[in-house]
Design a protein with these regions (language model features):
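Nucleotide/pyrophosphate-binding catalytic subdomain
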Residues: 1-215, 304, 340, 367-377, ...
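Terminal amphipathic helices with adjacent charged low-complexity linkers/tails
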Residues: 41-48, 227-239, 295-296
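Glycine-rich beta-alpha junction loops
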Residues: 44, 174-176, 221, 229-234, ...
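Short glycine/serine/threonine/alanine-rich loop segments
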Residues: 91, 165-166, 223, 284, ...
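Phosphate/diphosphate-binding glycine-rich loops and adjacent basic-rich segments that engage nucleotide
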Residues: 186-192, 201-255
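A conserved regulatory-domain signal marking ACT and ACT-like small-molecule sensing domains
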Residues: 238-403
Length: 403
């Protein structure tokens, strides 16, 4: 039986220097000797920010066809360098940009929506015995090459895995998913297995582990994902269908604005749902809470500060009035997982008191609890919530596992 193809995506940190590119090439060559492999390359660390800076220096519009051509070049260079490193090891390798790889998109420049994958060229390269090395973060739009938003290489990898019926490996600069960002919370614990739904909640809450749309596509298509470190593959997190475990994680999302407003009773629930869909095209982590009475709708919307004005414009186009409320510099801290057990409100209050936090808004929906606080209170609240909901739990969820 032919082994399933593995789509292995390397993040920018893993490709940050020529020596790391050579190490990645050695890993890929060793893996390709055992199973068919497709590689997805991110831009090297710092390159995308450098390219955006160049666009700003010449006074260019970041959301334009020309800007996307500039920004997409970072991944194209990474893919070509990785292909060259593989060739030096005696392996046939072919670098492909998003168009050549058969990735098709619609929507706006800089945040295009991946709509379809036609991996004919990738299959041809695999059949020839070569290793396809695909530039992530980009796809073909009718009028040119468009980018998929920051973190879009994750989406490239998951979409290719779905189209090729393969497995996805995301090689990151952390060895696994954790119950919190270990850089912010030293007590964070690794997670060995989580469900697609849990990953999607993590990503949407602001965890920098996976592009939110990549998590959604993986869940919809049933793509198994393995998160691992580019230097330490012994520790990993496997993402798949619900496995019966009930982990809890705490996520900080900084630089958030709260928009509040009202809408007339004539506005339908479908319109409110459309607002959420359109806002998530702008900001994948946007959150909307809405309540309705005989006078109409009351809404609260959390978006990034950079997208608040465009969010207000989107709402206006749907007949919904929004405005920035109070302090526009907020952080949201989300507790994700099974938090419905007795006493959760007491643990929440204890964490808020410990952090000396002043919540601006508190929302609970399903398996997620969201607390909005002034930005300076975000990290203390993250640590306090982690202690209450993770560290004081009867048994820690995360343990190391072998590759």
């Amino acid at each position: 039986m032919t082994a399933p193809v593995v789509i292995r995506k390397y993040g920018g940190e893993a490709l940050a220097s020529p020596s790391r590119i050579r190490v990645a090439a050695e890993q890929i060559a060793e893996r390709a000797a055992r199973t068919p492999i497709v590689v997805v390359a991110s831009a090297r660390r710092g390159v995308t920010d450098h390219l955006l800076g160049l666009i700003d220096e010449v006074g260019g519009n970041r959301i334009s066809r020309s800007a996307d051509r500039v920004i997409a070049s970072g991944e194209i260079v990474s893919a070509a360098l990785l292909a060259l490193a593989l060739q030096r090891l005696g392996r046939k390798a072919v670098a492909l940009d998003g168009r050549e790889a058969g990735l098709l998109a619609t929507g706006d420049w800089s945040r295009a929506r991946l709509r379809r994958v036609q991996p004919r060229r990738i299959r041809e390269v695999l059949t020839s015995g070569a290793i396809p090395v695909v530039a992530g973060f980009q796809a073909r739009r009718r009028r040119g090459l468009a980018t998929l938003g920051r973190g879009g290489s994750d989406l490239t990898a998951v979409a290719l895995a779905a189209a090729l019926g393969g497995e996805c490996e995301l090689v990151k600069d952390v060895p696994a998913l954790y119950t919190a960002d270990p850089g912010l919370c030293p007590a964070a614990q690794p997670l060995t297995r989580v469900s697609h739904a849990f990953l999607a909640e993590l990503a949407r809450a602001g965890a920098k582990v996976c592009h939110p749309r990549a998590a959604v596509v993986a869940a919809r298509e049933g793509v198994p994902i393995r998160f691992t470190h580019f230097q330490h593959e012994g520790l990993a997190t496997v993402v798949g269908a619900g496995d019966g475990s009930s982990p809890v994680a705490v996520v900080l999302r900084p630089d958030i604005a709260l928009l509040t407003g009202q809408a007339p009773a004539a506005i339908t629930g479908q319109t409110v749902r459309r607002l959420l869909v359109q806002l998530r095209r702008l900001d994948a982590g946007a959150e909307v809470t809405a309540s309705r009475d005989e006078f109409g709708w009351r809404l609260a919307v959390f978006v990034t500060r950079d997208s608040r004005l465009e969010s207000i414009t989107i709402a206006q186009s749907l007949g919904i009035g929004l405005m920035v409320t109070g302090d526009a510099d907020l952080s949201t801290v989300s507790v994700i997982g099974d938090i419905t057990t007795d006493g959760w409100t007491g643990r929440l209050r204890a964490a808020i008191d410990t952090a000396q936090a002043e919540p601006v808004r508190l929302t609970r929906a399903g398996r997620r609890l969201l607390v909005a606080v002034p930005s300076g209170q975000g990290i203390p609240l993250l640590r306090a919530l982690h202690r209450e909901f993770v560290e004081l739990a009867a048994e820690p969820e995360g343990v190391a596992c072998s590759a």
